[in-house]
From Swiss-Prot:
Family recorded in the similarity comment: Belongs to the inositol monophosphatase superfamily.
EC top class named in words: hydrolase
One Pfam family cited in the UniProt record for this chain: Inositol_P
Disruption phenotype: Inactivation of this gene results in an altered colony morphology, reduced levels of PI dimannoside (PIM2), and altered permeability of the cell wall.
Organism: Mycolicibacterium smegmatis (strain ATCC 700084 / mc(2)155) (Mycobacterium smegmatis)
Name under which the protein is recorded: Inositol-1-monophosphatase ImpA
């Protein structure tokens, strides 16, 4: 039985084991570089630290040599994401947290096969948490298999939501994001803003969060986490309810049952363009 094309489960397991060793090695400079200064200014007020750049170089080199599969990284790009097989890397998810000294930062690594996430790894070096999964599950936490997600209620769930500026415009204006947050807060147990999309998705997969919303579209923020949530038995769509793909402009990931309720609330908020 194949997973995608000629990628069988045994080969996929070996690839993830190799990737885990590479992320373990990358965790050393990750921890050592905490509170690193900005090295590269990007669009808007985003930036990359020198550690981002160094870790991406290290992981790309190691993955390419060990697996023969190309890598698409946040900082340097690389292999096209529609390649038959490609690793997708975010060397530091939560760069602002990382530079400020917050432990809510992670290394994200997903494996796409013809655009479909077939494996994901999310390492939180400061907390020691390691999440990994293959397509079909289960989710592994620190190397141990986890039971599938249950069906909690939204009222009992903590929900993660992406950070924002209320005055921002663009595809999902700040005022729209605030209204989504407000409407969710009336129903869910608590709302949390970790400032790291990949951490939110890993925590959904682990059952720590009942659900999470990302208003972003970058593949490196989502590839690993989508694989984790799906492997754990969760549901991943965009904010319209369409199944998530590499072309999606947003993410709504949640446990069964919670996803349906969150989607209802998001849809009831109206169209983002109405908040410009």
């Amino acid at each position: 039985m194949t997973v995608v094309g000629e990628l069988d489960p045994q080969k996929l397991t070996a690839l993830v084991a190799t990737a885990a060793e590479i992320l373990d090695a990358a965790s050393v400079p990750f921890v050592a570089g905490h509170r690193a200064d900005s090295a590269v200014r990007k669009q808007g007020n985003d930036f990359a630290t020198e550690v981002d750049l160094a870790i991406e170089r290290q992981v790309v080199r190691a993955l390419t040599e060990a697996t023969g599969i190309g890598v698409h990284g946040e900082e340097f790009g690389g292999e096209p994401i529609d390649s038959p097989l490609v690793w997708v890397l975010d060397p530091i998810d939560g760069t602002f947290n990382y530079a400020a000294g917050s432990p809510m930062a992670a290394i994200l690594l997903g494996l796409l096969a013809d655009g479909e996430p077939v494996a994901g790894l999310t390492w939180l070096p400061f907390t020691g948490e390691k999440y990994s999964a293959l397509v079909g599950g289960p989710l592994y936490s620190d190397g141990k298999p986890c039971p599938p997600l249950g069906s909690p209620t939204l009222a009992d769930s903590i929900i993660g939501i992406q950070t924002f500026n209320i005055d921002s415009r663009g595809r999902f204006p700040g005022r729209y994001r605030v209204e989504v947050l407000a409407n969710l807060s009336r129903v869910c147990s608590r709302v949390r803003m970790h400032g790291a999309t990949g951490v939110d998705l890993a925590y959904v997969a682990a059952g720590i969060l009942g659900g999470a919303i990302s208003f972003g579209h970058h593949i490196w923020d989502h590839a690993a986490g989508v694989a984790l949530v799906r492997a754990a038995g969760g549901v991943v769509t965009d904010l319209t309810g369409a199944p998530w793909t590499v072309d999606s402009k947003s993410v709504l990931a949640a446990a069964p049952g919670v996803h349906e309720k969150m989607l209802e609330i998001v849809k009831s908020t109206g169209k983002p363009e109405d908040y410009l």
